[in-house]
From Swiss-Prot:
Transmembrane segments: none
PANTHER family (alphabetical): 60S/50S RIBOSOMAL PROTEIN L6/L9, LARGE RIBOSOMAL SUBUNIT PROTEIN UL6M
Protein name: Large ribosomal subunit protein uL6
Purpose of the protein: This protein binds to the 23S rRNA, and is important in its secondary structure. It is located near the subunit interface in the base of the L7/L12 stalk, and near the tRNA binding site of the peptidyltransferase center.
GO CC annotation terms, alphabetical: cytosolic large ribosomal subunit
GO MF, one annotated term: structural constituent of ribosome
Family to which this protein belongs: Belongs to the universal ribosomal protein uL6 family.
SUPFAM superfamilies (UniProt xref): Ribosomal protein L6 (SSF56053)
GO aspect biological process, one term: cytoplasmic translation
HAMAP family in UniProt: Ribosomal_uL6_B
Amino acid sequence: MSRIGKRPIPIPNKVTIDIQGQHVAVKGPKGSLERTLPDKVNVVQENDTLLVQREDDSRTARERHGLTRTLVANMVEGVSKGFEKRLSIQGVGYRAQVQGTKLTLNVGYSKPVEMTMPAGIQVAVENNTLVIVSGIDKEIVGNVSAEIRAVRPPEVYKGKGIRYSDEFVRRKAGKTGKK
């Protein structure tokens, strides 16, 4: 039995779950999410918890058991609390601005980099150097954050670039030269 897959998912108040075959819809105060489950895995609602069960012990069913449980748990957490990623911009003259759904990054290129945010994603900027990406879908929040970081990843000599706020960038010593 999958250690992750057999753990029950608690359903918070104000969250409703609609299960129709392999289709799961979760609605909460922050919004609603839908997902089609993979084959050989079922979700069962018991009182105020969800249980993910597999049909048999085949390899594919065991592979998908823990994955499905985590995906459904992320849906429940997303519609109740939401997800947030923080990115820090470091470097002289590097800054970010938000105009509606557009994020503009000035990170040392000849022209500013403009990014349009997908639906359901909110972006905020604090002090021109801290970008906060938030939304209800953990996968989209992570992908958008990775795209923003990829515009100018942190470099190892001076540490300039865009990094996650909790990321540690390993620094390298530069050339020492002849003496």
